[in-house]
């Protein structure tokens, strides 16, 4: 599931315009909004939280989890930076912070769980 989610994420992120907007609204310039944005982009937070959580469940060994979190942080920065050169897309700080915050929340809960063992194996 994690690899499929990565493929979907890359497809949605690198498509010039909004693939979901094309599907739902028949207009590739409209981006569907799940909830209202606050300081960060809520859509980006939800996506990166979900992919981080699924990744954590997929790779729960310590060495793999560390590599996973490095990968996800790099991915969240790289994908948003690519919006600078993709037509119909724009780089936005709120999107980048939404990406990073989604990953960081899962990292935080992972280390809390590791320290206090809420969920024993």
Regions found by a protein language model. Give the residues of each.
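Bulky hydrophobic segments
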Residues: 1-96, 100, 104-121
């Amino acid at each position: 599931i994690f690899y499929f989610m990565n493929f979907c994420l890359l497809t949605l992120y690198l498509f010039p315009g909004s693939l979901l907007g094309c599907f739902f609204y028949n207009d590739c310039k409209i981006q569907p909004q799940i909830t209202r944005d606050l300081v960060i982009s809520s859509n980006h937070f939800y996506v990166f939280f979900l992919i981080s959580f699924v990744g954590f469940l997929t790779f729960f060994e310590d060495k793999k989890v560390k590599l996973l979190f490095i990968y996800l942080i790099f991915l969240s920065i790289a994908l948003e930076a690519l919006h600078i050169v993709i037509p119909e897309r724009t780089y936005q700080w709120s999107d980048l912070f939404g990406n990073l915050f989604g990953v960081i929340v899962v990292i935080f809960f992972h280390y809390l769980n590791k320290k206090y063992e809420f969920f024993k194996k």
